[in-house]
């Protein structure tokens, strides 16, 4: 994260502006603190990674899932690639393509004020979607990708992916909680989340936060587990789905939890086990 990026951040507690106090290297945050000009709270930055969340608010399934992801971060993506076709009879690539198209990345245009286009992935994990973002963007478009996650283990894997050139070059990573996104209102041109909201302790709050930080009119895309009503699973597939959704008895789309003013709502299955929920927040369409 660069020093000038701090202007896009907001205090997770009060949404006040943050000010950087610390060391920077090549204009990048290194070691120090982000201090809120409103409530005075400070947030640590270690090894260039901002930690903008409260540990005492990470509880229940949020804490459990973080523990799981931190324990096996290097195995997550390889297992997903192997198990998706085994469990669902559809490739991982086809499933990801099914929801990435809903982001309409190809329609993004330059901002008249010269600011880069900004894309946020809530729960970026090891960054499996980053190559697809890069491939879908219009050539030459200045874009920043922001990825946040509660798992430092997964973020470390994401950083390795970026160093290998498998993503968008201008990417920022930070540790944050989806229930209190550390960004100013209407910051991002695209916002999406894949594979975690079903385990959040307050999914409605997370949905409101995603809507808050999205620019009016932009598509927001949320993906997680839900058995396709038209799918006829085998006993093996039923057992696999139950294992994947061990954290809840009702794995389903949170459509009923969307903000009251959500519009253009589309709910669809992108694979036998995963739904894709697309919606927009009120306002004129974002064209540049």
Regions found by a protein language model. Give the residues of each.
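A short SAM/SAH-binding and catalytic strip from SAM-dependent methyltransferases
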Residues: 190-202
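A short glycine-rich, Lys/Arg-flanked "PGG" loop and its adjoining helix->strand segment in the class I
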Residues: 204-216
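A short acidic, Gly/Pro-enriched loop at the edge of an enzyme's catalytic core
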Residues: 179-191
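N-terminal auxiliary segments of SAM/dcSAM-dependent transferases
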Residues: 1-67
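Conserved class I S-adenosyl-L-methionine
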Residues: 7, 53-113, 128-132, 136, ...
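C-terminal alpha-helical "lid/dimerization" subdomain adjacent to the S-adenosyl-L-methionine
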Residues: 221-278
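Class I SAM-dependent methyltransferase SAM/SAH-binding core
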Residues: 118-180
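Short beta->alpha hinge that forms the Motif I/post-I loop of the SAM-binding pocket
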Residues: 150, 202, 225
